[in-house]
Every structure is written in structure tokens, then in C-alpha cells.
Amino acid sequence: MSDLSAICRRSLGPALVLALLAAAPLGQAVTLFSYGADWKLWRGKKAPSRPDYWAWTKANHDDSDWEIAQTPVFYGEKVTGGTELEDMKSRYISFFLRRKFDCPDPDTITSMTLRTKVDDGFVAYINGTEVARHNVETDKPKYNTPASKAATEPLRYRSYALKNFGDVLVNGENTIAVIVLNQRRTSPDALFDARLTAVSVESVPPEVKTVDPPSGLASSLGRVSVTFSEPVSGVDAADLLA
């Protein structure tokens, strides 16, 4: 998997994401955002959007009054970094997260995976459409909805293949929104962190346009220049030897 953790703490521009997808070997996942990223945070003391309760899941929702929080968002857990919700225990049962990510050419993406660590449950939406959930049985959970059961300790990362990503992604900027729920208000802990990856397959691979010097017999050879039909990366001399 391409290691983009450092740059994925902030939103990637469409051109950079497209370049990363194109440069990755066929079938290799590229990280769209990683663990420890910055999100927008709403503490679940009241509904995050009114009068349309579900507006918070949509790309055009105004979240300018939400806090900025680095994941993991948590309380009662032994973690390094992140954002601690010191006021959550016994006061509210949920929190909400939103962040943008870029997808410059959805038609080239063959799979997407959301990998999370969560305590207790969550439901994730992309551009207003549900794409993944865990430990939440309520069809449309609200800020006062409990998780269906407590998380199993110790917490482990779980992966969710997003089967309907092709129907919800748009070309360019997209928004993922997540509600995180505890089983009860007095739960001793809560946590959420996530990473989103995509696999892209190019329909037409790059071609070799010119080779200098041209093929033939040579008594000695110090350098060969190869020109491709488009920019490539990760190619060395061994890849070009017959």
C-alpha cells in the first residue's frame, strides 16, 4: 500500500490524488486520508443540523461552526495524540465527524476500503449516502441513539469494503460524515479513527515511445534513454531488460 500518511493528514488536491492513483502499480491501494487526520467535530449534546436532521451527512452542509479535531477522537482510552472528549462521559452518547477528500476520476476506481477502530459503534456516509456501519442496528441513528452493543476489547482495526462507492462518488471533492455512538451514556470509554483507501486500474497502460540508442548490438553501453507516452514512476533499469 502506498505510504502517504504524512501528506494525508490534510486534504489532497485532485491533481495530486490523480497522480498518485496513476503512479501506483495496478491493483495497489492508495490512501485518500489516513489515521491521525484532521476532521470537523460536533459533540452530540444536540442535533448537528436543523431543521433537516440529515443535512450533516451531505457534502454541502455548512460545518463552519464545528470544531477541528485530530483523530483518534476518544475518552477513557490509552492512546497517543488525537482529541480527548473530557466532557463526554455521562453527558452525551454520540459525536459526529466530517472531512473532505478528493476523488478526481471515480470511473477508474475499482474498490474502496474504510478501515476503522471504533468504540462502540458507527455509521459512515459519503455525500449523504450510507456506506458502512458497525454495532448500530437502528436504521437512521440520531444523536441520542445508543450503539446496539459494546465494542469487544481490546479494540482492533476492522475493514469495510464500500460496495456502493460508484453510485455516491463525484468527480473532485467528496465528503465523508460519521456518527459514533456509545452503548450507554455512562460507558467508560469511546474512540474513533479511520483510513480510506482506493484501488484504481488504468484502462490504457503507458507505452514506450522511443529508446536511445535504438536496439541493436553494442560493444559497450553507458546509458539508455527511454521515453514513455505519459509520466511514469517507480521504473528502473531492471524493468526494461529483456
Where are these regions (language model features)?
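Bacterial N-terminal signal peptides
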Residues: 13-23
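Aromatic-lined ligand-binding clefts that engage carbohydrates, nucleic acids, or primary amines
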Residues: 39, 66, 93, 101, ...
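Short, surface-exposed alpha-helix to beta-strand junction/turn motifs within ectodomains of secreted
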Residues: 223-242
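An acidic-aromatic loop/edge-strand motif
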Residues: 137, 146-201
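Short, solvent-exposed loop/linker segments at the N-terminal edge
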Residues: 214-220
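Bacterial N-terminal signal peptides that target proteins for export
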Residues: 1-15
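Surface-exposed, low-complexity/disordered Ser/Thr/Gly/Pro/Asn-rich loops and linkers
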Residues: 59-98
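Proline-enriched interdomain boundary motifs that mark the N-terminal boundary
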Residues: 204-211
